[in-house]
Every structure is written in structure tokens, then in C-alpha cells.
Amino acid sequence: MSKPIQMEKGVKYRDADKMALIPVKNMPAEQKEVLRKPAWMKIKLPSDSHRIQEIKSAMRKNNLHSVCEEASCPNLAECFNHGTATFMILGAICTRRCPFCDVAHGRPNAPEAEEPKKLAKTIKDMKLKYVVITSVDRDDLRDGGAQHFADCNREIREQNPNIRIETLVPDFRGRMDVALELMKDNPPDVFNHNLETAPRLYRKARPGANYKWSLDLLRKFKEQHPNIPTKSGVMMGLGETKEEIVQVLKDLREHGVTMLTLGQYLAPSRHHLPVERYVPPSEFDELKEIALELGFTHAACGPFVRSSYHADLQAQGMEIK
């Protein structure tokens, strides 16, 4: 029996080290038959990487993080090449250890006080018109990081008066009302919180999270800001059934959510949850039709769709796959 890992502050724990800390153990990929990626899951990389390096340099210069890099998003090259990125605030170490996610786990450092100003300046330098701000979970903070979100929104708007902001927030476990109150005066243009999967799979995929809590967060924000659209994302390929996903869509609509992203789960490494199934594009198309029939005004559904993938186009109602 191996010794438990003693986490050091500010150190990133990934892959096997991260998975060793999860109470619900999952079978390693080498013990299961690994599914081969079908033809529709192949990505064509851009021939010119100049814009990609530009964005990475801007991030490094200001000590900022993108969820695109930290979570090993398959769309990184495409998005960076188009000059878009999803900024990840409050550091790059998460207090949760979800086995589907590639963001590092550990004991994070204190939030950087100058991050809102640095973030706003970087966005201004990049001449962005639409920006997505997300964060790691910060269960170590009394407000879950809500004040930092509010500070970032305020600073971004001061330096970029015509920008539109989408925030992809954590669940603010145990401090929802405090968080919503702190963010009340500096809300985003789109409020996003991902359910990720069906409730049956939460213990396996989202240890520490609660399906009903996440739905309530979306509902309470909508009640507080009835004119701001709310959004949520769900992955497929973790072992859910189509019927379960349809029920998730119904639950989202019942809680006032009008924007949806639905994409294929991809395992970041052999240590993470394995892919149970590759969902064909035709099934995503069917689910999109169901979503629109249920009353979603925006539904981006496809194998490579991610919560912030072409978020600016999603917000305009353009078709994203």
C-alpha cells in the first residue's frame, strides 16, 4: 500500500498523483479496452502557429492562465489561431479532483491581487470583443473566489467599455448566497455553470459536487438577473444514456437556462476516466433538435463542442459543431 501524498502549497498534482487522491477509484485505462478514436474525432491543426505563440506569450508575460492549456482542450490550436482564449483566474491549481479534468489539483496559493488589472490590460492589448472568464474551484476561500470574479468583471469593463463578458463559474459549494451577493453589482453578459454529466454519474465524475446544488445556482442567478442569459455544458461518453441527457436538458430548462453546449468527453490521460463511448455526430444533431424543442435559444452540440468553444459565435446564435 502506497503512502498518502502530502500536498505542498502551490504544487500541481496531475494524472496518477491527482487520481490517487480521489476517494472513488476508477479502473485504470490499461485494464480496460481503450476505444479507438473514430474518423470524425480527427483534428486538423493550423499550418501557421504564429498567432498561437502570440497568445501564449501574452499569457506568460502577465502571469495569466488559460483553461485551454491547463485543461488540455483539443480545440486550443483552432481557438488560439483565431485570437480567442478562455482566461482562468484564481491560479491554476484546483481544490477539487474531478477524474475527467486535466486541471491540476493541490493546495493553491492566495489569489493575486493584481490579476484583475493584468487581465483587463491583456484583453485590451489583444483587442478582444468577447471574453470568457473561468476559474478553478477555490474551496479554500470563504467566498469561493466570487469577489475576485466581480473585481475582474469591473476592471475588464473599465479598460474595455465595449466588451462582452461570459463567466464560467464553479459551484461555490457551501457559499452560494454569499457568492451571488458579491457578484450582484458586476454581473457578466452571460452566466455559465456546467452540470457536466447526468446525476447518476456525479459520484464517479464529479466528487464533491451536487447536481441539485448546481441547478439551484443557475436558477438563483437567473432570479437575481432575469435579463442575463444563463448557460450550461454537458459531456457525453462517460456512460450516460440518451434518456438521462434528455432529462438533464429538461432540468436545465426548468431552472431557466436557455444556452447549451453538448460535446464529446475525451480522456486527458490513461489515468483519467476512460471514454465509454464515442457519440456519432448524428446523435448530437438529434439532441440539438430536442434542445431547441425544449426551448433552448442557443444549442451548440457536436463532438468538439466545449463550453467556451467559439463562445462569441454561440452568443450570437450561430451554429457551432
Swiss-Prot record:
Cofactor-binding details, from the entry: Binds 2 [4Fe-4S] clusters per subunit. One cluster is coordinated with 3 cysteines and an exchangeable S-adenosyl-L-methionine.
Q: Where is [4Fe-4S] cluster 2 bound in this sequence? A: 94, 98, 101
Tell me which UniProt keywords the record has, alphabetically: 4Fe-4S, Cytoplasm, Iron, Iron-sulfur, Metal-binding, S-adenosyl-L-methionine, Transferase
Enzyme Commission number(s): 2.8.1.8
CDD domains per the UniProt record, alphabetical: Radical_SAM
Q: What are the required cofactors?
A: [4Fe-4S] cluster
Positions with a binding annotation for [4Fe-4S] cluster 1: 68, 73, 79, 308
Task: Return the GO cellular component terms, semicolon-separated.
Answer: cytoplasm
Database matches in SUPFAM superfamilies: Radical SAM enzymes
The answer to whether keyword Iron-sulfur applies is yes
Instruction: Answer yes or no on keyword Metal-binding.
Output: yes
The record's principal subcellular location, in a coarse class, is cytoplasm
Source organism's superkingdom? Bacteria
Among the Pfam families in the record, one is Radical_SAM
Q: Which NCBIfam families match?
A: lipA, PRK05481.1, PRK12928.1
The protein, known as: Lipoyl synthase
Taxonomic lineage is: Bacteria, Pseudomonadati, Pseudomonadota, Gammaproteobacteria, Vibrionales
Gene symbol of the encoding locus = lipA
